[in-house]
Amino acid sequence: PGILGEGTSANFVDGQWLGTLLSIEREDGYWIKVSGETVELEVEGLPTDPNTEYSLHSGSNLVSYPFAGHAPIDETIPVYAQEAIIGIMGEGTSAMLTEDGWLGGLLELSGTEGYWFITDEAVDFTYNPPTDGMARMVSPVRDVPSEFSYRQSTQQAFYFVENATI
C-alpha cells in the first residue's frame, strides 16, 4: 500500500513506511493506493475546522474537502475562488469551468475524497459549508459489473469535446 500527496509519497514496505511523506496535513488531499481486494481503512483524528483557509498556488494543487457528506462544486467553492480554477480532478472524474458553468462528471465534492484543483493563479479561500441536508448525505458508489472491472490509475487524462460529428 501507499499514499500519494502533492509532490510527496510513502509506501509501506516490510513493515515500515518509506518515502518523503512524513505527516498527514488536514488541508491537503491524498490518494491511498492498495492492491488486491477491498480494504477497510480506519482513520483516527479530529475533524478539520470548516473555516480552514486553503492556499492554492498556480498549477496543480491536491486538496481535501473538510465536510462530511458532499456538496455541489458551484455552491461550496466561493465564486471568487472559482474564477481562478480551470478544472478539478477526482478519482476517475473531472470538471472544467466554462462560461456556462461547471461541465463534466464531477458535480460534487465529498469529504472522503482528495481533489486536484488546477488553477491559473494563486488564490486563498474557505469552503462554503454544505446546506444542512447535504452534509449528512453520501453519494452512492456505483457498482461496476465484473466484466468491466478495472484498476484505477494515478495517471489519468480527461478530454472535454466541444463538438463531435458521429
Say what each PLM segment does.
Residues 1-166:
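N-terminal exported-region signature
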